[in-house]
Amino acid sequence: MRSPKVKFLTIFTLSILITKMSFASSACFNEAGTMFRIEPNLIKAIALVESNLKKDSIGKNRDKKNNIKSFDYGLMQINQMHIPMLKKRGIIKDERDLLDNPCLNIKIGTEILYKHFSRCGMTWQCLGTYNAGFAMDNQKKRLQYAKKIYIVYTRLNELDNRKALAK
């Protein structure tokens, strides 16, 4: 169990990160949640873990030899494998759209998560596929990722409850 001081610092740090979100981006999480029937705080937790809420974040995925194998873009760290289909559907022109339009990035990431939940059920193990994919040998990575999301998600809900009680 964490000490009260560590718990306070973690919650304090989370509250600072959440303050960084503009009203518009909070509205985007809510809108994406409504569109895909996924709780907005779960989406926010993913964005916090994936990019620390940095809309222009570009992640590099590396293989065991440290070679770059793919890139992830924006708040929700949309993997480049999705770009051809997003272009084909007319949703983006190129990966720059994933960096320049945080609301669009949130909605695309939420749609990807929705498709994963549709495939393997609304479970923490399935949520882990958002980051670690569906490969059988990635089960441990999926659970580790899901645990990170769960911790942040729980803290976001605690903050919301504190705000509600303070009113």
UniProtKB/Swiss-Prot annotation:
<dbReference type="InterPro" id="IPR023346">
    <property type="entry name" value="Lysozyme-like_dom_sf"/>
</dbReference>
<feature type="signal peptide">
    <location>
        <begin position="1"/>
        <end position="24"/>
    </location>
</feature>
<comment type="similarity">
    <text>Belongs to the IagB/IpgF/P19 family.</text>
</comment>
<keyword id="KW-0732">Signal</keyword>
<dbReference type="InterPro" id="IPR008258">
    <property type="entry name" value="Transglycosylase_SLT_dom_1"/>
</dbReference>
<dbReference type="Pfam" id="PF01464">
    <property type="entry name" value="SLT"/>
</dbReference>
<keyword id="KW-0574">Periplasm</keyword>
<dbReference type="GO" id="GO:0042597">
    <property type="term" value="C:periplasmic space"/>
</dbReference>
<protein>
    <recommendedName>
        <fullName>Peptidoglycan-binding-like protein</fullName>
    </recommendedName>
</protein>
